[in-house]
Amino acid sequence: MEAIKDFFGSLLLTELFKGMRLTGKYFFKRKMTLRYPTEKTPASPRFRGLHALRRYPNGEERCIACKLCEAVCPALAITIESDQREDGTRRTTRYDIDLTKCIFCGFCEESCPVDSIVETHIHEYHGEKRGDLYFTKDMLLAVGDRYEADIAQRRAEDAPYR
């Protein structure tokens, strides 16, 4: 009985019509695919992307070399070296982040008592060599200087939720 049913099913092309019905169902729906470089999905305001080091308005870097971010980093991606100044304060001489190790968890940003290290909204960066994804203190300060207005605005918007 099953063989006869299969014979008439294939003779009447029911499998073809079932497939065409499924194709037609999705053919007229709105497309979900975006053409990436020209079209982008909106990112969350809390998106964690490329790191940046911030400065105070007078131009002095915020980092006080407390090394909390280095201690809390689960991937051990942050390396900090510091020196004592003549006035008794500590400042970093070396602040490196290896983005090949970083898991973008945001613990460094949360642990910083002076809001020095932040994660920006930038997610489009690349490197041709492994060393290109190793960010030094000067590179992180340059990112912070370039996007300071945007960083300050996003942190002000997010302040009620902290």
Swiss-Prot record:
Residue ranges annotated as coiled coil are: none
- Cofactor(s) of this protein: [4Fe-4S] cluster
Q: What is its main location?
A: membrane
Instruction: For this UniProt record, give its keywords in alphabetical order, as a comma-separated list.
Output: 4Fe-4S, Cell inner membrane, Cell membrane, Iron, Iron-sulfur, Membrane, Metal-binding, NAD, Quinone, Repeat, Translocase, Ubiquinone
Membrane topology field: Peripheral membrane protein
Instruction: Give one GO term, molecular function aspect.
Output: NADH:ubiquinone reductase (non-electrogenic) activity
At the top of the EC hierarchy, this enzyme's class is translocase
Catalytic activity of the protein: a quinone + NADH + 5 H(+)(in) = a quinol + NAD(+) + 4 H(+)(out)
Q: EC?
A: 7.1.1.-
Listed name of the protein: NADH-quinone oxidoreductase subunit I
Organism listed in the record: Bordetella avium (strain 197N)
What is this protein's gene name? nuoI
